[in-house]
Amino acid sequence: MPIQVLPPQLANQIAAGEVVERPASVVKELVENSLDAGATRIDIDIERGGAKLIRIRDNGCGIKKDELALALARHATSKIASLDDLEAIISLGFRGEALASISSVSRLTLTSRTAEQQEAWQAYAEGRDMDVTVKPAAHPVGTTLEVLDLFYNTPARRKFLRTEKTEFNHIDEIIRRIALARFDVTINLSHNGKIVRQYRAVPEGGQKERRLGAICGTAFLEQALAIEWQHGDLTLRGWVADPNHTTPALAEIQYCYVNGRMMRDRLINHAIRQACEDKLGADQQPAFVLYLEIDPHQVDVNVHPAKHEVRFHQSRLVHDFIYQGVLSVLQQQLETPLPLDDEPQPAPRAIPENRVAAGRNHFAEPAVREPVAPRYSPAPASGSRPAASWPNAQPGYQKQQGEVYRQLLQTPAPMQKPKAPEPQEPALAANSQSFGRVLTIVHSDCALLERDGNISLLSLPVAERWLRQAQLTPGEVPVCAQPLLIPLRLKVSGEEKSALEKAQSALAELGIDFQSDAQHVTIRAVPLPLRQQNLQILIPELIGYLAKQSVFEPGNIAQWIARNLMSEHAQWSMAQAITLLADVERLCPQLVKTPPGGLLQSVDLHPAIKALKDE
């Protein structure tokens, strides 16, 4: 067979294979054209699931008479005229293929009128060469498209259509997605002459939650957490459902839009899933309705003819931006502050220095052994600093020290060896000590410990606070700063800016790097324990704290930060408790020897044992 140019109708039918998959695809393309025309009201009439009739009527700007024939021609569009337009596309349509493709596999009629015209005009294409016929018609300002007998001339495609109910459900889903994208447009959907959906336009500044509830249901609305997140040219808005109350029905609600265009993007879904993974089960999915706005030059929508895929030029930046935005609202809404005691508490009874836990102790390993899967890698400075010097910087510690030592004097002491210089002992002796063996978790945040037959309770949030303070407290080398992929920019007052400048050297030792200008401060790096925190909340609170101080000591700032960090765990597991105590015993050995108030409490089982024996 010789090479030849395909007839227009056949070429359009081939293109229709990508654009027109089913009746819902036709509805999507035509409704998007109405939105591009500036319509504020769109009426959609469907018969027999779209196989018999699809009628889209809008009140948009309409099409001029001399452009009607071009509207049905392939590769004809009013959206773009150059490559620059394509690279900065903001309209929903731009390929100029939809109407030509649809008209090649159906009987399509286009009726339109502009505000400048006295009468409307109707156009339709027919024949092998798709010749367009234009004639006068009666019609208000706007456009109506009628698609009759879809796939009438392509029986192979028609037989793949599903039942009327299934095809209409696909159309209904498309309209739901479009209605969520454009709250300012009234959309009415009818099937076989009956009104099925009525989505009324929401006035500017009005409550969008009413339409959100009508589309996604009251169950989603009750669990929806609003998101408002911005960085540079990136903006993320919308709602994500509370992961702690996600159900299989809610998990079906996953709507994402990029510059108003509905999308199915793996990168976006992965970022959202990653932000929610700590609160979702292995078989659960997050529920969300999110709107991403990005510079059109930074996203390529010309990936697939159906335009449901995009490519981001800086995909990693977009991924982390979405991840941080979703994680921020989840932490702000769901996490609770650590239970910290402001008042110094009496020191618990002294515990003998030489301890051996029953069974194999995960915490009493040699110093060279790495802890089991720590959440944070401690800064080298914390590990290399002499252990005896760190607790002395904590308020209230010295008051307890005297009492603890008096109690220790009453404890039988082992045989004394010749004294060695004090600085050489702590590191070796500390690692031979342990809080004990973790038996179980009590009340979700306390560890029940056993050592030499003695039982005690340890507060995991308080232990976590002391560990973070150790990780943040600088030693011989400043704490390692972790650059932020998206720097945090905040507006500050003159007093706050002055305090930040005075505290800059102290903050640098803690791994917090910032740059200030006239009225703003930009946080560029933070220490590792702060990376998973909601910096939008923590940093302003830290700035407020610094503004009230006259002296800026790194130790005091580290203590304040540790007390104000959100806990990583709403409910603790055995593995998490074991990992935490391993890190605490390695970095804070003094806590094992002289536990501060609120950390450890002995449990006396003798009365219970005696009562059992007396029965």
Curated annotation (Swiss-Prot):
One of its GO terms (biological process) is mismatch repair. GO terms for cellular component: mismatch repair complex. PROSITE patterns: DNA_MISMATCH_REPAIR_1. Residues 373-391 have a biased composition (Low complexity). Keywords: DNA damage, DNA repair. GO terms for molecular function: ATP binding; ATP hydrolysis activity; ATP-dependent DNA damage sensor activity; mismatched DNA binding. InterPro entries: DNA_mismatch_repair_CS, DNA_mismatch_repair_MutL, DNA_mismatch_S5_2-like, HATPase_C_sf, MutL/Mlh/PMS, MutL/Mlh/Pms-like, MutL_C, MutL_C_dimsub. Pfam families: DNA_mis_repair, HATPase_c_3, MutL_C. Residues 362-397 are annotated as: Disordered. NCBIfam families: mutl, PRK00095.1-1. Belongs to the DNA mismatch repair MutL/HexB family. HAMAP family: DNA_mis_repair. This protein is involved in the repair of mismatches in DNA. It is required for dam-dependent methyl-directed DNA mismatch repair. May act as a 'molecular matchmaker', a protein that promotes the formation of a stable complex between two or more DNA-binding proteins in an ATP-dependent manner without itself being part of a final effector complex. This is DNA mismatch repair protein MutL. It comes from Escherichia coli O6:H1 (strain CFT073 / ATCC 700928 / UPEC).
